[in-house]
């Protein structure tokens, strides 16, 4: 991968930054707080932003630029495997895409989403490889020395060993599946051992069943023939018996019907006599109707007029009352409208004045909002200082650096003492060995060597060795504690180094805050809020007045409409009174008296008309009953004739039916049906059994074939199993060999770089693979020593050497290295060495991007980009 261009918008101190990178060593240089590391973080976020980064505690709010217009956006152009890519992320809209150029045209390389883009980049360059071998972050140079397991994970990903391990495990599963198949087939062969016997037994049973089927099939036809004859005889006798029963029922029904007709005739004759008497009575009442008709006509006319008159009168009086009240209310509202019109004009003038003043105050309110944002940022940054002031942070950092120097000097002094003690111990042990071998003269003092003198010297040297070992143990423990303290101190140093950057940001923001006149701005804001509240209140009142004035205007038309309705109602009322007078009445009371006089005649007329209607109805019913009586007599004669015919037929049928013969035939029919049913059921049972036996035979023969196939397949599976086991062994051996060769190469590169850093003090870096661990050792004076032997500065140098070795190993596959401030924890001599290493080693990597505030590194760079902070914004300047 080679990064060609990075565009950053509203990311931390970067408002709009465009940086182009070239092949070779690219150096981004600038003072602390100028946005150098932020640019590298933008590359990390741009490439890998996903749940993984969010779970590590990185949030959008932490890198979104305060006061920035528009959202945070990152665009990265890079090249990989001779293909050009453009990656874009917009964090405010949660939009992302990755495009690749093919044949001069751009197409989407993945789904356009945050997670899909990150997944695609992960396939090109895994996140853990990028973070541990490609991108060496500020203060994290020696972090890879902390855990053997983490280091092993990085090495596995760099070497693609995970794929081999996956293949190894997949083959293990295949081996298990093959074994299961072999066991399954062996089990099947064991289960089907007596297959030939089962086939023979089923074939014998089939022959037996087929013989019985033939026997039953020959018996059935004659029995079925006799059954059909008997069934016909029984059917004929049952038909006669049924007809006899049916005729008996019909005769009984006809007799019942005859009785009913006789009773009906008696009832009709009685009803006819009663109706004749009632008709005579009603004819006497009806004869007075002509006399009453004139009075009834007058009554109806007057009563109809009165009802209509009273209804219209009530309606008109009610409407007049309602319209006159509404007219009065409208006139009052119209009078009030003039006052509201004047108030509306007064409010409009006041709103214009307030609006003008609000526009004047708006810039002050916006400026105060910016100031508040700066205050919030200062508070958030101060919270990260854990209660310390910026000055206290600088003071604490200086104190920690001083303490680190003291501990390193103490470790150096102790290391020298340990070396001296080990030398003294070795000298004493060498003297004891020489004394054991010596004869004649003493190798120590030159005197004659007696056994007593020899014993005395050896005891003295042994005692001295014991004292040296005790002192060595105490001193080694003291050194271990100092190194533990040094590691803790370096963690604090990294923490306070970050806090120092935060403190500088706070100073910059506080300086910016001083540029705001907060007291004046807050006063303007209070005035703005008060005027805004008054403006909204007046605006609401004006809207209410305007609605009222619109309603008043509409009421003018309503008033004219109501006045017209009142006029028409009064005309209609006068017309109603005129109609009353035309009938000859001066008042409604006179009309009611006449209606009361006519009511007696009306009641008599109504009663007579009811009787007239009843008379007509009775005469109609009388005629109907006479007709009904004639019909009943005719029906009675028909029923008597039908009874006589049915009884004759019944007598004839009874002479043809013999009950004893019928019962004998029925018993024979049941017996034959049972016999046929039994034989048929047995035949069906035998046929089903034959089909089952045939199916069983087919299955058994298939199993026999499968059994033979299973024997052949077992042989094939056993051969395949042998091949799988052989392949697993080869993968395991290759993985071990590949890892060993790679670690040897990484060890060679790291040894060369680390030896240069330490002026040859440490001759080698040993990288050794163990189960799920990759361990590191250094060689000092020909002996392997653990990393606890190193001073703090030497650990930084080793961390840098190992990371550079990983990057150098990746040359040709991933030609990219990113270094963020590699020099802060290196002394002057090691910084000088780093320049030499850059010239001799980093030149092999196609592209190196390095961030530093150290001007010395410019000499080793091919392309220098300078960042500076102006007005809280990062600015880019290409130096060379």
Swiss-Prot record:
It comes from Pyrococcus abyssi (strain GE5 / Orsay). InterPro entries: AAA+_ATPase, ATPase_AAA_core, P-loop_NTPase, Rad50_ATPase_archaeal, RecF/RecN/SMC_N, Zn_hook_RAD50. Zn(2+) binds at residues 442, 445. Belongs to the SMC family. RAD50 subfamily. This is DNA double-strand break repair Rad50 ATPase. NCBIfam families: PRK03918.1. Residues 397-494 form the Zinc-hook domain. Homodimer. Forms a heterotetramer composed of two Mre11 subunits and two Rad50 subunits. Pfam families: AAA_21, Rad50_zn_hook, SMC_N.
